From Swiss-Prot:
Belongs to the YejK family. One of its GO terms (cellular component) is cytoplasm. This is Nucleoid-associated protein ESA_01050. InterPro entries: Nucleoid_associated_NdpA. It is found in: Cytoplasm, Nucleoid. GO terms for molecular function: double-stranded DNA binding; single-stranded RNA binding. It comes from the Bacteria. Its main location: cytoplasm. It comes from Cronobacter sakazakii (strain ATCC BAA-894) (Enterobacter sakazakii). Keywords: Cytoplasm. Coiled coil: none annotated.
Amino acid sequence: MSLDINQIALHQLIKRDEQNLELILRDSLLEPGNTVTEMMAELHRVYSAKSKAYGLFNEESELAEALRQCRRGDEDFLAFSRAATGRLRDELAKYPFAEGGIVLFCHYRYLAVEYLLVAVLNNLSSMRVNEQLDISTTHYLDINHADIVARIDLTEWETNPESTRYLTFLKGRVGRKVADFFMDFLGASVGLDTKAQNRGLLQALDDFTAEAQLDKAERQNVRAQVYSYCNEQLQAGEEIALSELSKELPSFGEKSFQEFTAEQGYELEETFPADRSTLRQLTKYAGSGGGLTINFDAMLLGERIFWDPATDTLTIKGTPPNLRDQLQRRTSGK
């Protein structure tokens, strides 16, 4: 992994009681040795693999202005990180989920792109066995479960300030409150809506195949092609590119899929991240509620599974063997 650390700083927030978060600030930067570089490579990998929301700085963002000053050389990175940790403490203190932790600021480069990553990591205790087979306690950073993380693509921000996606943050296990916290701390607003982009793609695809008057098998084949391309992009960590996707699909009436989306005004970006849960709808029908969960391949609709919209009834012909076995045992009273 080609990851080069420019500067990295660690500070700490300690929750002393329900009202106060104590601030402990380092007086120097960390040396980016092998251990630190390995830690950042792991954090970069974990962060890149997780679902993220996108944003952009507001005009009045204090963090953005401080970052500009740091980039111009008006303030050094350590001073920037210390001041930002103070603002972070003030914002975190507003939320009941705030537990403190190790605050990390890292300016690094990965594949010719510069990033600033900000994270609050839990410092956990565990057990270890040494060479003499004695057991002792040890501490470690819980990187795999980090959910208070934000990253700024400095290259994108500085070369394309009109972008709506240079700032990303994790949605977090405690839901919307973490997103609100990041918006407040970063002085940012929501940017590119990846789910909306993916939903727009699916709607455009349905309209495209409908206009071409394809039969069910042909429509399903096109949807499978789109899913295959998008899933490959997702697995490779790449974005969906409309021009590339359009080349994968047949043209109907001398009109490509990309031309169709542009003419119909779907407002799709030229490239955008794939959303796994939304794209799954290309090949699956799924839903849950009221104690019922249903998930089946799209090709089965109209063949083994039938929906009557008038009565909102699904009829399934041929149940899975393990489900049938359970039904038989339960209904027979065994």
